[in-house]
Swiss-Prot record:
Iron-sulfur cluster binds at C56, C61, C64, C70. Keywords: DNA-binding, Iron, Iron-sulfur, Metal-binding, Repressor, Transcription, Transcription regulation. The gene is feoC. InterPro entries: FeoC, Tscrpt_reg_HTH_FeoC, WH-like_DNA-bd_sf, WH_DNA-bd_sf. GO terms for molecular function: DNA binding; iron ion binding; iron-sulfur cluster binding. This is Probable [Fe-S]-dependent transcriptional repressor.
């Protein structure tokens, strides 16, 4: 079972990661990692960095039925 400290240490080693990458690396369930990242954000230890929509070459993200599901969300330590 992953701990909050392991999530923090992994971010410190890798620089920035997506929640899914953290989940796979630590072999922990995605909802648990999401909760830990939110807790680190509340504590002021981690920052969520959403990817900008200007990377969409076709400009169809606004009309995408998945509602910008293709945009990545990165996490970094503060």
């Amino acid at each position: 079972m992953a701990s909050l400290i392991q999530v923090r240490d992994l971010l410190a080693l890798r620089g920035r990661m997506e929640a899914t990458q953290i989940s796979h690396t630590l072999r922990a369930p995605q909802p648990m990692i999401d909760a830990m990242l939110n807790q680190l954000e509340i504590m002021g230890k981690a920052v969520r960095i959403p990817e900008e929509a200007d990377g969409c070459l076709s400009g169809s993200c606004k009309r995408c039925p998945e509602g910008k599901a293709c945009l990545r969300e990165w996490w970094v330590l503060r």
